[in-house]
Amino acid sequence: TEDPVPYAQALADNPYAGTWASGAAANTGRSEVASAGTSTANMISGGEPPITGKAEQWNGSSWTEVSDLNQSRYAVMGAGTTTAAISFGGADPGNSRIGNTETWDGSSWTEVSDLNEGRFRLGSAQSATYTAALAFGGADPGGAVASTETWNGSTWTEVGDLNAPNYQIPGGAGTNTAALKIGGANDAGSEIALVESWNGSSWTEIADLNTARDNLGGAGTQTSAL
């Protein structure tokens, strides 16, 4: 029988109904990297093992190595594009939680003002920019944190905390004024399903994920996420 709705039209009506496809491997295999950009123009930096500052760019078909971060680190977060990106937080080779922030101009990284609270395995608004970014949650030496900071292109400012401290939350979506915090782990290390919505000044708990999980991916906007 004929499908009631052609696949192409269904995909146009609901782009999240698509499928995953394999792409070319990065030049250096690693985990816990910072990511910035889109599915056809992306950039990754940092990661482990071993803990590195290596950065690579994706053009939709292949990866190319570019200039390294000044500070090697893993469990780091990022935002922006392949020509204007920001990388922040993480843990250094000595496993110290750091607040180091670096910006990318298309050819090299420059160290700028640090986060107020050094942390790793934090969250980021994936559609934010290198002049308007958001950092939330993560873990410092004392455990999971709830603190949130916004970046204005030159400095980080502490703003409203998450309702619950959690870390291992790379799953984030939206911008620095309209974002989602998705899943993660609580201070005991248990996976959680908690989702919070950010309006530019405060976080509000909303509907949970169907399956609790941490170290997940996130994409989209505050009102249409994956």
For each feature predicted by the language model, list its residue ranges:
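Polar, enzyme-active/binding microenvironments
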Residues: 1-226
